[in-house]
């Protein structure tokens, strides 16, 4: 079973990102715009309950916070990914750290750069052209964040929510 842990921004931010993703992201139909807290990982079905319990613990230790999204960035020359930059708040950093320590120990492929992907798998020329145009536009959004989501991947490659975790002390 393949799982991932993400934050979904508001519908308004998703709509702005999807307006670009339709043209520049071949993964557009597989998953809504999101901020990745933990990249996809494989696990056994019997571990799911322990994972869910650990995520409840992490959510309870994390206060709700404000998400700040703005400007367009790129991971070039490592890869031709375009994204909306997301401010790295203490809460986002804490969530990411908790999901790579202790129970979730796993080698990181990249350092944590919170972002919303708006384009990927672009040729060098297309990447340079689109990045140049988008950097001239003014993007800035903010919204309160009070939850994150555990996703699982279906056989057709799409992702769906398994469970949602509310930040702060949950009502059990």
UniProtKB/Swiss-Prot annotation:
Pfam short name (any one): 2_5_RNA_ligase2
GO molecular function: hydrolase activity, acting on ester bonds
Enzyme active site: 34, 115
UniProt enzyme class: hydrolase
InterPro entries in the cross-refs: 2H_phosphoesterase_YjcG-like (IPR050580), Cyclic_Pdiesterase (IPR009097), YjcG (IPR022932)
UniProtKB keywords: Hydrolase
Full protein name: Putative phosphoesterase BcerKBAB4_1135
Entry similarity comment: Belongs to the 2H phosphoesterase superfamily. YjcG family.
Stored NCBIfam families: PRK13679.1 (NF010223)
Span of the annotated motif HXTX 2: 115-118
Statement: the UniProt record of this protein carries the keyword Protein biosynthesis: no
E.C. code: 3.1.-.-
Motif (HXTX 1): 34-37
Domain of life: Bacteria
Keyword Hydrolase set for record: yes
């Amino acid at each position: 079973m393949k799982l991932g842990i993400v934050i979904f921004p508001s519908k308004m931010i998703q709509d702005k990102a999807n307006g670009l993703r339709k043209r520049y992201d071949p993964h557009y139909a597989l998953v809504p715009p999101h901020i990745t807290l933990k990249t996809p990982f494989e696990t056994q079905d019997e571990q799911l309950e322990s994972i869910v319990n650990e995520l409840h613990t992490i959510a309870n230790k994390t206060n709700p916070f404000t998400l700040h999204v703005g400007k367009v960035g790129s991971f070039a020359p490592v890869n031709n990914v375009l994204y909306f930059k997301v401010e790295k708040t203490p809460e986002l950093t804490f969530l990411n750290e908790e999901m790579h320590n202790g129970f979730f120990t796993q080698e990181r492929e990249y350092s944590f750069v919170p972002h919303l992907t708006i384009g990927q798998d672009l040729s060098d020329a297309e990447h340079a052209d689109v990045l140049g145009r988008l950097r001239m536009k003014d993007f800035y959004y903010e919204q309160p964040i009070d939850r994150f989501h555990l996703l699982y991947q279906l056989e057709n490659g799409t992702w769906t929510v398994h469970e949602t975790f509310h930040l702060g002390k949950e009502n059990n």
